[in-house]
Amino acid sequence: MTLGKNKRISKGGKRGKKKAQETMSRKEWYDVVAPKNFEVRQFGKTICNKTQGTKIAADYLRGRVYESNLADLNKTQGDDDAYRKVKFVVQEVQGRNLLTQFHSMEMTSDRVYFLLRKWCTTIEAAVEAKTADGYTLRLFVIAFTKKQSNQLSKNCYAKTRLVKWVRHRITNLIRQRLSKVNINEAVTLLTRNILRDRLAKRCNPIVPLRDLRIRKVKVVRTPRFDAQALLNAHGEIPASAEGEARVVEEAQEAPAAEATA
C-alpha cells in the first residue's frame, strides 16, 4: 500500500472564516511638537497602536526621533536655513501631543561640498561643551582661509601655528558661551547664527576666514529627565483643530462599532 496523504481524513471541520480586522482601526495619530524657541510648533504627525492592556502607547512613543528642516521650523526664506536639518527626540506624551527636545542638527552634505575650495586651508574643530542645565553638546566647526585684499599669491594657506590658534580660540569661546545658558537658549544661539557670527568675528584677526560654519551639533549626554523643565521649555502648546476633530471622530466611531457587533 502506498503511503500518502488522505485528503478526506485530513480535511478539517466546517469553520467560519476569520473576520478581517482593519489595521488602521487599532491605531491613533499624534502631533509632534517642537520647543517654544521655534516658530512652527507642530511640525509633524505620527501614528502608533492604541493602548491595549499592558501595552501602553506612550511607552512606544518615548524615544522616537523626528527630523525637520530648519527653514520650515522658522519660516525663513532663502537658503540660509534650508541646508540644515534638525532632529528632535520625544521625551513625554501629553494627550495627543508629543513633547520633544533637541537631539541634533546637521548641514546637508551637498552644502558642505559646495563650501570646499582649492588653494586654501580647511580648519576643523570638534568641541564638547556642557550647558548650565547639564546637557553635553558636541559641536563640529569648519572654516576656510581666504585671500587678503592686497594679496598677489594664488593660494592662501595658513601656517600650522595659526590653525592651532584658531582652533584653540573656537574651543574656548564655545565652552564659555554655552556654560552660561540652558539647552533651549543654546539651540537659539545655534539656529539664529549668533554663536557662528561671534566665532567668525573673534577668529578673523588671527587669519582671514570665509564660510565659518557649525557643521554638526549632537547631544552626547543628557541630565536626568525633569518633567517641569520640559514643560517650561514648551510653554503653552497651541491647540490642533485636526487633533480635536480626530478625538471627536473616534468617540463617534466607538458606539457605532459596538452596535454593529
Curated annotation (Swiss-Prot):
Domain of life, source organism: Eukaryota
Provide the protein's localization.
Cytoplasm
GO CC list: cytosolic small ribosomal subunit
Main localization category: cytoplasm
Biological process GO terms, please? Answer: translation
Q: Where are the transmembrane segments?
A: none
Where does the record place Basic residues bias? 1-18
Does the keyword Ribosomal protein belong to this entry? yes
Query: Quaternary form?
Result: Component of the small ribosomal subunit. Mature ribosomes consist of a small (40S) and a large (60S) subunit. The 40S subunit contains about 33 different proteins and 1 molecule of RNA (18S). The 60S subunit contains about 49 different proteins and 3 molecules of RNA (25S, 5.8S and 5S).
Task: Provide the protein name.
Answer: Small ribosomal subunit protein eS1B
Taxonomic lineage is: Eukaryota, Discoba, Euglenozoa, Kinetoplastea, Metakinetoplastina
